[in-house]
């Protein structure tokens, strides 16, 4: 059954996550999980490469959304700034739950952020990778 989107933001987020998965697979990551959810948080993508786990947060923004950002602030527009301290704390708890539930608490891991800039009309995307975010 296809996913039903309740908002344009959710649709953009889902497309961005799909683009992120393709990007990771192209760069030799194995995708282990998507949208791992607990009541206290969510992990967008869990991937593995070279025997290391990667917990990936995806932030997506469409060109249509960017058109509402003024020219003066566009150069400084950083969706990664939406990684608020409370979000990081919730993510840390969710990661610990994931590791324990999968018996992976001894495995090396890191948190990365993929910022996906979408041009939905042109069907293009640019990806910015922010590696090893400190929780």
Language model regions located:
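Conserved catalytic cores of phosphodiester-cleaving nucleases, focusing on short active-site segments
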Residues: 24, 43-68, 91
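Short, low-complexity, polybasic intrinsically disordered segments
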Residues: 117-135
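Catalytic cores of nucleic-acid endonucleases
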Residues: 60-117
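Acidic-basic catalytic patches of nuclease active cores, encompassing PD-(D/E)XK
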Residues: 1-34
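Short acidic/glycine-enriched loop/turn segments that link adjacent beta-strands
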Residues: 38-41
């Amino acid at each position: 059954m296809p996913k039903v989107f309740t908002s344009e933001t959710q649709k953009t987020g889902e497309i961005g996550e799909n683009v992120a998965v393709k990007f990771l697979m192209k760069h030799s990551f194995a995708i282990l999980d998507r949208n791992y959810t607990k009541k206290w948080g969510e992990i967008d993508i869990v991937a593995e490469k070279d025997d290391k786990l990667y917990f990936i947060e995806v932030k997506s923004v469409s060109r249509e959304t960017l058109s509402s950002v003024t020219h003066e602030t566009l150069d400084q527009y950083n969706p990664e700034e939406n990684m608020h301290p409370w979000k990081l704390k919730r993510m840390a708890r969710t990661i610990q739950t994931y590791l324990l539930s999968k018996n992976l608490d001894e495995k090396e891991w890191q948190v990365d952020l993929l910022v996906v800039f979408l041009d939905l009309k042109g069907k293009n995307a640019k990806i910015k990778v922010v590696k090893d975010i400190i929780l």
